[in-house]
Amino acid sequence: TSTITLSLPMNVYEQVELQNDIGNLTLQNVHADRISLKSDTGDMDLQSITGKSCSITNNIGSLSLQEVQIREQTDIQQDTGDLELTDCTFHGSSAISTQIGSMHLSDSEFSAATIESDTGDIRLKDCTFYQVCTIKSDVGDVKGSLLADVNNTSIDADTDVGSISIDGKKNGYQVPNALNTLTIRVDTGDIRLTTQQPTA
């Protein structure tokens, strides 16, 4: 397997665009207004990335993002393979989707986000959702932990086939005029979440 390594001077770039047919793609310590990444077959690994907007398309292979901060708009499309987000912050609006594969979202913040999975579990660990966010799963469980002020966050959960438990409640938290709203919809699968008050 051949490897191509590109080293860029430390700078804030207007645009970084990479396209890959076959092979793994690793991107580290990049700061750009616009980031566009496309890969057909291979794993993608992003670490310490900041930008205004980010578009990632991965057809076959795993996708891992760590310490990625996007200020305005995020679009992540993962076709076949697992998706892992760790210590990430997505402000503005974000659309994150997988077709076949599990999602693992850890210690990350989302604003105005839509997170969708066709086939595969969605695992959350200490994630925070601001404004109006939606999690959808066709076949797979939604499980884990949230950082949420339940006095200012409305959590609306529903599954067609499966059970629901949010802090032991079957209906989540219905808060009138809530600052933040998280809607969870599952066709076939369980919803099991716990909440913890975020630290100031």
Give the predicted meaning of each segment.
Residues 2-10, 29:
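Extracellular beta-strand-rich solenoid/capping regions of secreted or surface-exposed proteins
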Residues 1-2, 198:
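Secondary-structure transition/turn motif
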Residues 15-71, 75-77:
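Right-handed parallel beta-helix
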Residues 8, 13-14, 92, 130:
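Extended, structured, electrostatic nucleic-acid-contact surfaces
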Residues 54, 63-200:
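Short, surface-exposed interaction patches in beta-rich subdomains
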Residues 8-11, 21-25, 184:
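N-terminal segments that cap or nucleate solenoid repeat domains
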Residues 3-5, 17, 157, 183:
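Extracellular beta-sheet/turn segments enriched in Thr/Pro/Gly and aliphatic residues
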